[in-house]
């Protein structure tokens, strides 16, 4: 958005629930947008309201994800904006918002093309979550819900003028379901000038392992739990002076219970850079998820040595052994971390290569150029 705002006028329409500070969100978006319209979403993400919405979805043909963003106020807001103002492109950020009528325009004008940003293939992610849920009831509910979401998501893609994805792997998955769909790959990108090694940064302490991400999400919570149970004990046995820092907001009680002499949970931090700068190793032990992980791009931009699972690094054009280390078994993952903790020169070499890859392939300017090229292609072929 920062890059697009330099060359285009942007209008943002967003639903905001109680997990976000509306004023803070508005101020942040205003820096880049001509106009920011926030629509309150009273349908909660947690607690009783979430459970009621899940119950509604049981007796509905609609998925939970769709019900959670079906708002009369959003429909009226979009109708008012699209029918009175002219836009060149309507960019839809998530496919489960595709039920809103985006084919509106001022009288006598042709509606703008609709382009969907598929951060990940949502139904595939929901399918993974359904299989990972422990109880039979949750698995049955998840199995029904992801199939509803698949129908809704594919319908949104079919109705759009184009879909862009974060990785070639996701693009191929989607084209397998919808051959002939107009797609493009726009990689997840980081501000490589913001995330960069700085002379003022403290040097890595040589013993700190870092994981970061929003801890309320299923992939992050599962990854941290998996690492704590299966990998961290193997690291601590070899390096008893090592510490593990878990950075991210909204941890569950079970994750908070991990805190101890060697394990720190920081909660949300406003600036990741000092924490990443002090890390000897960044770990991405993910077993669930889709798209590409921005956390890897940010850590690469900071010149960090990373150990990841294959899934965690999916979609990143990195070579294991050069730009990061990839291991899928607990013993191999722990051994990779131990080698980096014991070999700072190896960690430095991998970190330097990772930084170069981030600058060359995953900077904001390159991603913005790829997206603008896709926009131009769609506009040139529009009737």
Feature locations, PLM:
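Donor nucleotide-sugar binding/catalytic pocket of nucleotide-sugar-dependent glycosyltransferases
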Residues: 38, 113, 123, 142-197
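Conserved catalytic-core segment of nucleotide-activated headgroup transferases in glycan assembly
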Residues: 185-278
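Conserved acidic donor-binding segment of nucleotide-sugar-dependent glycosyltransferases
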Residues: 324-331, 339-344
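N-terminal subdomain of nucleotide-sugar transferases
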Residues: 1-39, 85, 237
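Short hydrophobic beta-strand element within catalytic cores of glycosyltransferases
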Residues: 295-298, 305-309, 325
């Amino acid at each position: 958005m920062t890059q697009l705002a330099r060359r285009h006028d942007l209008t943002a329409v967003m639903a905001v629930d109680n997990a976000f500070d509306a004023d803070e969100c508005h101020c942040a978006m205003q820096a880049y947008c001509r106009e920011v319209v926030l629509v309150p979403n009273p349908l909660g993400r947690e607690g009783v309201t979430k459970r009621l919405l899940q119950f509604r979805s049981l007796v509905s043909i609609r998925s939970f994800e769709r019900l959670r963003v079906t708002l009369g106020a959003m429909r009226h807001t979009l109708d008012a904006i699209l029918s009175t103002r002219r836009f060149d492109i309507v960019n839809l950020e998530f496919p489960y918002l595709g039920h809103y009528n985006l084919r509106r325009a001022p009288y006598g004008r042709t509606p703008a093309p609709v382009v969907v940003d598929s951060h990940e293939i949502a139904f595939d992610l929901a399918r993974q979550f359904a299989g990972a849920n422990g109880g039979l009831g949750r698995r049955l509910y998840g199995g029904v819900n992801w199939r509803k979401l698949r129908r809704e998501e594919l319908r949104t893609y079919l109705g759009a003028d184009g879909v862009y994805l974060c990785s070639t792997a996701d693009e191929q998955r989607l084209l397998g379901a919808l051959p002939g769909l107009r797609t493009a790959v726009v990689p997840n990108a980081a501000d490589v000038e913001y995330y960069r090694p700085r002379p003022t940064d403290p040097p890595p302490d040589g013993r700190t392992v870092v994981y970061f991400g929003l801890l309320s999400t299923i992939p992050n919570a599962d990854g941290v739990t998996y690492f704590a149970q299966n990998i961290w004990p193997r690291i601590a046995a070899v390096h008893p002076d090592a510490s593990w820092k878990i950075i991210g907001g909204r941890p569950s009680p079970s994750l908070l219970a991990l805190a101890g002499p060697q394990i720190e949970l920081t909660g949300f931090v406003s600036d990741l850079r000092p924490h990443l700068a002090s890390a000897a190793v960044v770990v991405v032990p993910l077993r669930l998820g889709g798209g590409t992980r921005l956390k890897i791009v940010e850590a690469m931009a900071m010149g960090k040595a990373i150990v990841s699972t294959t899934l965690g690094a999916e979609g990143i054009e990195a070579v294991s052994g050069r730009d990061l280390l990839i291991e899928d078994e607990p013993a191999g993952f722990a051994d990779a971390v131990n080698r980096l903790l014991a070999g700072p020169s190896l960690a430095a070499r991998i970190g330097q290569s990772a930084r170069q890859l981030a600058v060359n392939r995953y900077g904001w300017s390159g991603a913005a150029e790829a997206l603008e090229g896709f926009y131009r292609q769609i506009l040139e072929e529009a009737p």
